Regions:
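C-terminal motif of bacterial Sec signal peptides marking the signal peptidase cleavage site
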Residues: 15-16
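Papain-like cysteine protease catalytic cores
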Residues: 72-171
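N-terminal regions that are enriched for targeting/export leaders
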Residues: 22-37
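Sec-dependent signal peptide recognition
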Residues: 2-10
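Structural recognition of the beta-strand scaffold that forms the well-ordered cores
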Residues: 50-53, 77-80, 113-115, 124-127, ...
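A short glycine/serine-rich beta->alpha loop
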Residues: 37-48
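Active-site signature of cysteine proteases
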Residues: 35, 154-333
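Active-site nucleophilic cysteine motif
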Residues: 46-60, 103-115, 281
Length: 333
């Protein structure tokens, strides 16, 4: 069913995984949704930098909802395992080496969620989630100084259940993970000129702590890749830059300053090399829309709560997605 959505002028809120404000005049937009995949409820990552976990889990959830299998996964479980892994590593380093290590962080990439699921399994949301006021930034600082890793994680996030119960069936976290996300089920792609096309390479962005590899595709394939996946009923996990002046969660959409320009793969590469396109944020792409001028937009499920005109969703213009995509992850890319 086609839905018409309206956008009105409000102060700009520019947000990456952490949020800050800057005033900017925004054009009025009216969107018509042409294709919309089902999703789980919009969540809120709070002040953490866990967008990469929320977006990847949202993509997995939508895949199952489309198949008629309702599932709501625990971002806190994945986050806990990531923090645990970092903290344990620090415990077994000599102090002089540990001092040179990066601080414990919640930053990462969407593919790292899949790595952590493969290693530690999964829990569903009802069985394991933190209190709404839990501050991951404070927890990271405490873990940097503490040797009582499990005790601190239990106290801050919650005690881990040893098993998973779903629809009367008992699973281990590993068994549950395999029931919702098989190893190698998802493909990760990117597009840059400093590596050969159609080969995989570890993407050189600061948050790629696991040195995950991405298949390098031509830039001209970015948009068709997303469109084809959505039309076949598969969501796409989007990873990209949200630093542009016309990216506004408060208004519910993102555009480039020059939407009419014919952007090229060389423009993408230049922006990446000059740090104008950086790995800021992750969202789940779940639909296709157009505005009152007939311009195509992609509908994304965000993880910043529901306090915007579209109840937590955002519209990203096609030029924005072309220029500002760092990586895509999906089952049908």
């Amino acid at each position: 069913m086609r839905k018409i959505l309206y956008l009105f002028m409000l102060p700009l809120l520019i947000i990456s995984c952490s949020q800050g404000a800057k005033k900017r005049s925004f054009p009025k937009e009216k969107f018509t949704i042409d294709l919309l995949l089902p999703t789980s409820p919009v969540k809120n990552q709070g002040s953490s930098s866990l967008c990469w976990v929320y977006a990847m889990l949202a993509t997995i959830e939508s895949e199952h909802i489309i198949q008629g299998d309702s599932v709501n996964l625990s971002a806190d479980y994945v986050a806990r395992m990531y923090l645990y892994e970092q903290a344990r590593r620090r415990q077994f380093l000599p102090k002089r080496v540990a001092r040179l290590e990066r601080s414990i962080t919640t930053r990462g990439m969407s593919t790292m969620t899949l790595d952590l699921i493969k290693t530690y399994g999964l829990q569903h949301y009802d069985a394991y989630h933190s209190e709404p006021d839990m501050d991951y930034n404070v927890l990271c600082r405490r873990l940097d100084r503490s040797k009582k890793v499990d005790e601190l994680l239990d106290k801050s996030i919650g005690t881990l259940p040893k098993q998973v119960f779903m629809f009367g069936v008992r699973y281990t976290p590993y068994e549950f993970a395999r029931s919702v996300c098989m190893p190698e089920e998802y493909t990760a792609v990117t597009s840059f000129l400093h590596h050969p096309l159609h080969e995989s390479f570890p993407l050189e962005v600061p948050d790629n702590y696991f040195h995950d590899t991405f298949l390098n595709i031509p830039a001209k394939d970015i948009i068709p890749c997303i469109v084809n996946s959505l039309k076949k009923g598969h969501p796409v996990c989007w990873e990209g830059d949200v630093s542009e002046p016309l990216f506004s969660f408060e208004h519910g959409y993102a555009m480039l300053d020059d939407e009419a320009r014919q952007w090229t793969e060389k423009d993408r590469q230049k922006a990446f090399e000059h740090f104008q396109t950086t790995d800021d944020h992750c969202m789940e792409i779940v639909g296709i829309a157009h505005d009152q001028h007939g311009k195509r937009f992609f509908l994304c499920k965000n993880s910043w709560g529901t306090d915007n005109p579209y109840h937590g969703f955002m519209f990203l213009s096609e030029p924005y997605v072309y220029m500002k995509t760092i990586a895509l992850v999906g089952t049908n890319l």
